[in-house]
Amino acid sequence: MSRKKKSRKPGAAGAPEFMVTRNRSESDVAGRLRKKDKKRKGLKAGGRNSEEGAQQKHGSSQVRDPRLGSKKKIPLIVEPAKKLTKQERRLSAEQELEMLENDAKLNVLLDRIESGENLGRGLQQYVDEKLDRIEQLMSQLGLLEPEAEEEFEDEAPVRKSRSDDDLLADFEDFDMDDYKG
């Protein structure tokens, strides 16, 4: 009698296990399937591209790239640029003036100037540009009151034009000794 090898399975020592009997065709089919699976152990060729395609199919209903396939109609005839009317320009000037008057940075810098602080060259230039633009917009909109220059002219003494002889006489009469220390 031939010798049987000992099995390490726990149930092998006591009761014999039931043997599954298959006919030859079933075992052939099972063997072929195992062999086929062994051949295809690795990843599919071109798997990188096919996986992205599968992910796009699942996510296409949720996330869509807005750059692809725009449905916006494009005009084939170029229309000339519409010029702004005076009223529209005035509105835009009013809006710009409002924006400049509410400029937080400019207000802070003006407060610093009023408190006697000296600003740097760049900040002072910024303030000057903005104030000039405000003045220009106010004059454009007719909000700027004309300065009273006539009053200053009346207060200033009017100099008479002097002749060359008068100037020469003043020069000759001038005494340098009065200014020596």
Swiss-Prot record:
Residues 146-155, 166-181 have a biased composition (Acidic residues). One of its GO terms (biological process) is ribosome biogenesis. The keyword Repeat does not apply. GO terms for molecular function: GTPase activator activity. It comes from the Bacteria. Residues 32-43 have a biased composition (Basic residues). Residues 156-165 have a biased composition (Basic and acidic residues). The keyword Glycoprotein does not apply. Keywords: GTPase activation, Ribosome biogenesis. InterPro entries: YihI (IPR007336). Residues 1-75, 145-181 are annotated as: Disordered. Interacts with Der. Belongs to the YihI family. A GTPase-activating protein (GAP) that modifies Der/EngA GTPase function. May play a role in ribosome biogenesis. This is Der GTPase-activating protein YihI. The lineage of its organism: Bacteria, Pseudomonadati, Pseudomonadota, Gammaproteobacteria, Vibrionales.
